[in-house]
């Protein structure tokens, strides 16, 4: 069973990748006796396991023992440090967070103890074990993804769109309590007259509404917008990971009959968890949304996906018609689960479901610094600003302010001829990380030392401490550097997005890159992520 902390994390009650404190047991005489059964002192690996309340005899993996992504990152870091400290620096690179979620602690402890005791062939056994686990894990994961992606819910339901009836009038929205969701809710209130039913996980309706209001507050709504919220918004108590969202048959029928449009934005965004850990919400949740979309009443589905479905693609240009059908270069749970989720939507569209797919790249805070976004890009930029380091890498960095992206998504959905299309919600003009740090330097007076990507990552690793927001993502960054380098000149085509945005009376053009970066900086200052002497 996962721990309560894990469950709260998955439900969205915890801030993504917020810091945790690991309580260390004192290594005094009594605790040493527990560790080493009477020995005067414990070896480094035993001490490490004890620090995380592990004995080394557990048959479960860290994930099974309830370690959330933050604690996994802490353990992986400390394990690598211990392995290096014991003189096996070349083996520390074998430590992979995805594998630590799978290996039994008893097996891991036996492997590291072999190193500590200088057992014959210990290094070989260590490397071979991790290579074996990686191979088995990858094969099982690929098989699971292919099976999940091939699932045809419409065929199972024997769904015929011609038999669906008209009648629903409400909009149904998932993921409204995350970062992007409140901006979608705002845009729906502004650009439509329909009532909105919002899926929220909670034990009671008043608790759900309070949680939704707190999320909406992060975008600083006007009094007029709050009035619209009070008049037109109501919550649906439910859980994306459960069949029919956990609703009673009567509640499900009521929802089916009242809704004619769905915006599916709900998902876990996490760069550390593996596919299986994200499957229930990101994949099974999409199936339940599709089950609603293919219900009694005709509905349109607007699916919020991501450009991460392309993984570490090395194609020169990625078009909106591309679907990464061969599942290429997908090696972390978020990209994998969102790819499968998208395939499920495409499967339903082949049977006649009216749907659109939107793929944002990097969603940033609004140009006024609103929202609550602590994703990898914000963490990395805060770290770079703190240390005055940048990179010469030419990878496309496409930041779309959340308010603008949400506004244009809703605007495009008003056009009936946009049904059946996919849209890359990206900036029209190319920009690199160097362009971003140049503007940050102008706004803050901070000087940035630029490194090649090959040298940039070691600089980050050498400077990053456990209290840095970036720390939990270090393993991901190190493991990804070669992939990032290989796709340096990849670009996203957003022809559909530009065409329909420009055709819509509500469509809004990209703000300047300076405005986007200033919004990011304002957010970081407002949330005390960074501090600068020069005011903006």
Place the predicted regions along the sequence by residue.
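Phosphopantetheine-dependent thiolation modules in NRPS/PKS and related acyl-activating systems
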Residues: 2-158
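N-terminal Rossmann/SDR dinucleotide-binding element
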Residues: 65, 127-261, 265-268, 275
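Amphipathic terminal alpha-helices
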Residues: 122-151, 155, 170, 193-200, ...
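Conserved Rossmann-fold NAD(P)-dependent oxidoreductase catalytic core, especially the SDR/UDP-sugar
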Residues: 257, 261-265, 272-280, 284-333, ...
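A conserved pocket-lining segment of Rossmann-fold NAD(P)-dependent short-chain dehydrogenase/reductase
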Residues: 274, 377-404, 408-412, 416, ...
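Active-site Tyr-X1-5-Lys
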Residues: 328-359
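A hydrophobic C-terminal alpha-helical subdomain
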Residues: 392, 457-504
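Mid/C-terminal beta-alpha module of Rossmann-like enzyme folds, strongest
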Residues: 412-480, 521-536
């Amino acid at each position: 069973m996962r721990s309560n902390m894990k469950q709260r994390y998955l439900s969205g009650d915890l801030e993504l990748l917020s810091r945790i404190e690991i309580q260390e047991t004192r290594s005094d005489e009594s605790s040493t006796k527990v560790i080493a059964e009477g020995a005067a002192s414990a070896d480094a690996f035993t001490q490490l396991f004890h620090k995380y309340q592990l004995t080394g005899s557990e048959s479960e993996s860290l994930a099974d023992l309830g370690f959330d992504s933050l604690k996994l990152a802490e353990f992986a870091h400390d394990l690598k440090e211990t392995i290096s400290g014991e003189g096996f620096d070349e083996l520390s690179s074998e430590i992979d967070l995805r594998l630590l979620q799978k290996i039994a602690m008893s097996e891991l402890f036996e492997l590291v103890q072999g190193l500590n005791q200088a057992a014959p062939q210990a290094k070989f056994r260590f490397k071979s074990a991790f290579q074996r686990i990686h191979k088995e894990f990858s094969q099982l994961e690929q098989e699971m993804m292919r099976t999940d992606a091939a699932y045809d819910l419409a065929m199972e339901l024997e769904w015929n769109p011609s038999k669906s009836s008209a009648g629903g009038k409400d909009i149904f929205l998932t993921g409204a309590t995350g970062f992007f969701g409140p901006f979608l809710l705002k845009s729906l209130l502004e650009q439509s007259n329909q009532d909105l039913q919002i899926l929220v996980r909670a034990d009671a309706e008043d608790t759900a509404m309070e949680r939704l209001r707190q999320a909406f507050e992060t975008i600083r709504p006007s009094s007029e917008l709050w009035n619209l919220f009070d008049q037109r918004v109501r919550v649906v108590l439910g859980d994306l990971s459960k069949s029919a969202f956990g609703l009673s048959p009567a509640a499900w029928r009521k929802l089916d009959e009242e809704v004619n449009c769905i915006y599916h934005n709900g998902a876990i965004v996490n760069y550390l968890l593996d596919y299986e850990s994200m499957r229930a919400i990101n994949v099974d949740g999409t199936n339940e949304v599709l089950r609603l979309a293919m219900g009694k009443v005709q509905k349109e589905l607007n699916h919020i996906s991501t450009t991460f479905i392309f993984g570490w693609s090395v194609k020169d240009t990625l078009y909106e018609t591309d679907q990464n059908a061969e599942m290429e270069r997908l090696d972390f749970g978020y990209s994998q689960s969102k790819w499968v989720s998208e395939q499920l939507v495409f499967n339903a569209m082949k049977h006649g479901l009216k749907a659109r797919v939107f793929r944002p790249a990097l969603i940033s805070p609004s140009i006024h610094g609103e929202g609550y976004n602590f994703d990898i890009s914000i963490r990395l930029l805060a770290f770079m600003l703190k240390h005055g380091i940048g990179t010469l890498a030419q990878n496309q960095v496409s930041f779309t302010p959340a308010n603008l992206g949400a506004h244009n998504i809703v605007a495009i959905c008003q056009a009936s001829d946009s049904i059946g299309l996919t849209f890359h919600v990206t900036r029209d003009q190319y920009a690199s990380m160097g362009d971003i740090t140049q503007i940050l330097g102008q706004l803050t007076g901070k000087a940035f030392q630029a490194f090649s990507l090959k040298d940039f990552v070691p600089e980050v690793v050498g400077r990053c401490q456990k209290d840095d927001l970036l720390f939990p993502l270090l393993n991901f960054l190190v493991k990804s550097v070669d992939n990032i380098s290989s796709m340096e000149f990849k670009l996203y085509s957003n022809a559909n997005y530009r065409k329909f945005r420009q055709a819509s009376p509500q469509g809004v053009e990209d703000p300047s890159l300076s405005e986007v970066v200033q919004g990011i900086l304002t957010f970081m200052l407002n949330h005390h992520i960074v501090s600068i002497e020069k005011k903006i």
